[in-house]
């Protein structure tokens, strides 16, 4: 009986330590952050609507206070860095990619299983554009942010959609990639992914 308890304890401990810690797993997680912090010093990141593990992929994406100030990248903001190099916005925890809702109305994005084609172009001006319509950029809503349901100070939320690219109001359209490397935070402009 004692051996059975010991074996069970070892197996349980092995299982616990083998579960993925999404910030430190074999998937290199990063967040995509608006380069301008706007009205939140923590910045705005692409985020699945809902709360972390309980995010609702059917509700789509938004711009939300970046969670990395808490010391790790949250699963509802964590994108696979290797898939970004393939021009895909892939959230590995939920196994979904961002896609235009349709070719007729590409202004909104939804989340679904990844396809084999690239959906986005990361431009030299640090914008994220649709591959099949490079006149449209991923854009954070202007105006005042809405208050979220958590955080201290409260997290802030803004709508996110594809809008016409232009230099006017570029602070709402320019993006960077941020993550952790050897325990230290790094950020680089989205245009740096074009060289890969």
Residue ranges and their predicted role:
Residues 1-8:
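Bacterial N-terminal signal peptides that target proteins for export
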Residues 22-33, 56-93, 108-141, 148-196:
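Exposed, tryptophan/tyrosine-rich binding patches on extracellular proteins
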Residues 25-41, 46-48:
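An edge-strand/N-cap motif at the start of beta-rich repeat modules
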């Amino acid at each position: 009986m004692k051996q059975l308890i010991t074996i069970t304890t070892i197996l349980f401990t092995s299982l616990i330590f083998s579960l993925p810690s999404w910030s430190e797993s074999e998937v290199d997680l990063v967040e995509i952050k608006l380069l301008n912090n706007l009205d939140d010093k923590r910045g705005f990141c692409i985020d699945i609507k809902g709360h972390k593990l309980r995010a609702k992929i059917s509700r789509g994406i938004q711009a939300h206070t970046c969670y990395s100030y808490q010391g790790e990248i949250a699963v509802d903001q964590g994108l696979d860095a290797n898939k970004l190099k393939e021009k895909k916005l892939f959230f590995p925890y939920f196994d979904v990619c961002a896609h235009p809702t349709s070719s007729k109305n590409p202004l909104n994005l939804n989340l679904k299983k990844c396809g084999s084609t690239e959906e986005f172009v990361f431009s030299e001006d640090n914008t994220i554009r649709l591959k099949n319509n490079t006149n449209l950029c991923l854009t954070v809503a202007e105006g005042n942010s809405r208050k979220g349901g958590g955080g201290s100070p409260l997290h802030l939320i803004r709508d996110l959609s594809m809008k016409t690219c232009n230099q006017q109001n570029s602070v709402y359209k320019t993006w960077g990639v941020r993550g952790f490397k050897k325990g230290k935070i790094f950020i680089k402009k989205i245009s740096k992914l074009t060289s890969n």
